[in-house]
């Protein structure tokens, strides 16, 4: 789960991670009031969407008067912001964050992620603040300094010193940086975050460090421990079909291809997408119906997959362990009665009661339900069907 910049900064401040003062607004007059309360003569108006690259897309603007704050906010609210992370459809701006202007001496990058290879959190820093970190990693990876942190000992001063030396910070700034980085580590660990990114982390004229931007992502499986963070979820920023799928216990992620996938188990779902690619196709989604699949969840799965107009075929790939294949076969037939399935459905069922399942599908004699002998055969048929070649 991701949250907005203003929400991430609220969490930062609770842990003593310094940020500029600011407030959220939903209308132009509200934005003006926030700027008035902040005082000063320079403000930044920032579109609040779950995507990076806002500045380049016109979603971050400076204002030098209260009138300008109101005008920029009114122009920004309701606009569709298209960045490299939103896709071509973009995201509609429904709120803006008004922040006091800052005295920027230098821009840095600081972030934390979980390194799955090392099985440890990693803190990363770079002198290339303000740039896309993916671009820095691709073109000048030597400019990214990393430290892996063993949770058993936690974040230590030597971790921060390594980052500070790599950033070339003078001695009089290192103590302030160590304090900042230590607080950020606590934010990450205490809240079960998956990712934190501050880009840019700025140095001010008086040698202070401020989080000028803030991104946070959380482990959905840990949200039950953090109800106050779960309340920050903005469903408007999420794919509607993904939200709908969660209500039925389905794990669904929309992709850009045309071969719909319905699979039980995340590992098998990933393998299914891989083999579709291998056969020359493009998966339209990731959909894990889980171990407790029943006719209702299968029907809902079809409904969600078919809500994507790009889907030209569906590959149902089920390995029956806990869930019986005959139950899935009956679920598929019941689903076709509830939902208009107007594309070829290639079905590969293996495992518990697979033969009974094959018999059920054969006896049903439904034209667009096509059995597959194995995984490879199923993927080939699904890709061919999507291309209109089956």
Curated annotation (Swiss-Prot):
Reaction it catalyzes: succinate + ATP + CoA = succinyl-CoA + ADP + phosphate; GTP + succinate + CoA = succinyl-CoA + GDP + phosphate
Molecular function GO labels: ATP binding; magnesium ion binding; succinate-CoA ligase (ADP-forming) activity; succinate-CoA ligase (GDP-forming) activity
Entry EC number(s): 6.2.1.5
SUPFAM superfamilies recorded: Glutathione synthetase ATP-binding domain-like, Succinyl-CoA synthetase domains
Residues binding Mg(2+): 199, 213
The ATP-grasp domain, residue ranges: 9-244
Listed PROSITE patterns: ATP_GRASP, SUCCINYL_COA_LIG_3
Keyword terms of this UniProt record: ATP-binding, Ligase, Magnesium, Metal-binding, Nucleotide-binding, Tricarboxylic acid cycle
GO CC term, one of those recorded: cytosol
Name of protein: Succinate--CoA ligase [ADP-forming] subunit beta
Gene coding for it: sucC
């Amino acid at each position: 789960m991701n949250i907005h910049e203003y929400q991430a900064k609220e969490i930062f401040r609770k842990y003593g991670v310094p940020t500029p003062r600011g407030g959220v607004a939903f209308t132009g007059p509200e934005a003006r009031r926030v700027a008035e309360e902040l005082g000063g003569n320079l403000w930044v108006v920032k579109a609040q969407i779950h995507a990076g690259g806002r500045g380049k897309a016109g979603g971050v603007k400076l204002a030098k008067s209260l009138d300008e704050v109101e005008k920029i906010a009114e122009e920004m609210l309701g606009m569709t912001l298209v960045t490299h992370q939103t896709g071509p459809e973009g995201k509609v701006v429904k709120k803006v964050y008004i922040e006091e202007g800052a005295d920027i001496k230098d821009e840095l990058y600081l972030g934390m992620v979980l390194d799955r290879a090392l099985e440890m959190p990693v803190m990363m820093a770079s002198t290339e603040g303000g740039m896309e970190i993916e671009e820095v990693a691709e073109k000048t990876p030597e400019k990214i300094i990393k430290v892996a942190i063993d949770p058993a000992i936690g974040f230590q001063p030597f971790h921060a010193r390594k980052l500070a030396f790599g950033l070339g910070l003078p001695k009089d700034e290192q103590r302030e940086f160590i304090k900042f980085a230590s607080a950020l580590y606590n934010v990450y660990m205490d809240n079960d975050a998956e990712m934190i990114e501050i880009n840019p982390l700025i140095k001010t004229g008086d040698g202070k460090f401020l989080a000028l931007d803030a991104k946070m992502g959380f482990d959905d499986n840990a949200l039950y421990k953090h109800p106050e963070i779960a309340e920050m979820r903005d469903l408007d920023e999420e794919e509607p079909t993904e939200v709908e799928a969660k209500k039925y216990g389905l794990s669904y992620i929309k992709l850009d291809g045309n071969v719909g996938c319905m699979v039980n188990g995340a590992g098998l779902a990933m393998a299914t997408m891989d083999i579709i690619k291998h056969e020359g196709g493009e998966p339209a989604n990731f959909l894990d119906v889980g171990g407790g699949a029943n006719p209702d969840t299968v029907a809902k799965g079809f409904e969600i997959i078919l809500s994507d107009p790009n889907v030209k075929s569906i590959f149902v790939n089920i390995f029956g362990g806990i869930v019986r294949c005959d139950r899935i076969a009956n679920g598929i037939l019941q689903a076709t009665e509830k939902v208009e399935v107007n594309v070829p459905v290639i079905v590969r069922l293996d495992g518990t009661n697979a033969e009974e399942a094959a018999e059920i599908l054969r006896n049903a004699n439904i034209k667009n339900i096509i059995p597959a002998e194995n995984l490879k055969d199923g993927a080939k048929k699904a890709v061919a069907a999507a291309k209109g070649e089956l």
